[in-house]
Amino acid sequence: NQPLVVVDGTPMDNFTGGVDDVWGNSGADMGNGLSDINPEDIESMTVLKGASAAALYGSRAGNGVILITTKSGRKNEGLGITINAGITAETIFLKPDLQNDFGQGSVGVYDNQSRLSWGPKAMGQMVTDWRGNQIPLHTYDNIDAFFRTGTSFNEGVSFQQNIKGTAVFASVNRSDDASITPRSKLNKTNITLRATTFLDEAEKWKVDAKVNYINQNAHNRPIQGVNPSNAFNTIYNLPRSLNIREFEDDVDEQGNMIWYDASKNPQENPYWVTRYRQNEDTRNRLLGNISLKYAPTDWFDIELRGGTDYYTTTKSEKVYAGGNTSPRGLYTEGSETFYENNFSFLATARKDNLIDRLGGFVTFGGNLMLQQRNKMNASAGELLVPNLFSLNNGVNKPTVTSELIRRRMNSLYGSLQLNWDG
């Protein structure tokens, strides 16, 4: 049910990562395709709905269109150079209203293996903790204790020039983000080149060409959903009388994860997760388009356009030995390649008082869309040699799955609107 995202007239794939399965387990937060756009390059955004969306983009616009127009340099006369730099800090804005009266356990009885917080009232009385030590029973603020202040550093420079009907725009932007979750970071580089020019002195023929390259590298994206590796889920549901700081030393002398929960399906120590359950991914993306527009009169024009959206993503997940999932560790890797090419034409006529006080607005267009998505995932399963991350180092043969999806869409669309100047 997503709207169609169109950047400078060309549709882009607004993929979403980390979609929930039937159990609410969505894996790593992979973000979405729209986040690849550099916000500093955006000139305007428009939301189209209903007939106006369908008239321009056909059946793909059934859920509406987010129309993004990026900077072209045409608004500035002469030469312009812009340098920007910014630092942003983020913390958890809203926290659930958690009770701070009762400790670990249920029905008023203390239990050092319980995940619940309905044990005895925490009044400093002595209890035996999960290590077998005698400690006073208190409650703790584990949310602020575990999560840190996230930071985002953004630096960019843009160049724009408009001389004699030709406009040029170029920009380079770099962002380095450190998440509120420890050891999680995201780095992104965005490069844009665009040129717009008229081919004749009467300015009836116009050419617009643009290319945008994005490189993104992520380390330890946070895990989402009902997942034992989800730090948010673990911290928010941790018994109120457990101090998460006790688990910063996350492995014992044998290299096994330290954690209070010895049940059959325990959650994982969130400190251990950030160090020993590592995921990495790299995405390289290219967005490009070129258009030729002819406007013989001030009320009629026709435009031909070609555009492409191409990206590759490689990813891997390493689970070290000593955790709950596998005593020797796990290793998986995967890749995805996607492209979508669009070729379209659109004729537009708008004229008031065409016949007496009757006017109208007419559009007619067509589009050829070619799309392909190729996915491959491979897993070594449980490792034969602990912490040697290779597909050939599995106890069993590696499992490989692949998926190839091709789509082609030919469409014609148009609209007619009449108006009466009363």
Question: What kind of region is each of these model predictions?
Answer:
Residues 70, 83, 151, 157-161, ...:
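Residues on the lipid-exposed face of transmembrane beta-strands in outer-membrane beta-barrel proteins
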Residues 39-82, 152-154, 175:
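A beta-strand signature from Gram-negative outer-membrane beta-barrel systems
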Residues 10-49:
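Short acidic/polar hinge/loop motifs at secondary-structure boundaries
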Residues 2, 7, 75-138, 180-184, ...:
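Surface-exposed loop/interface segments of Gram-negative outer-membrane beta-barrel transport/assembly proteins
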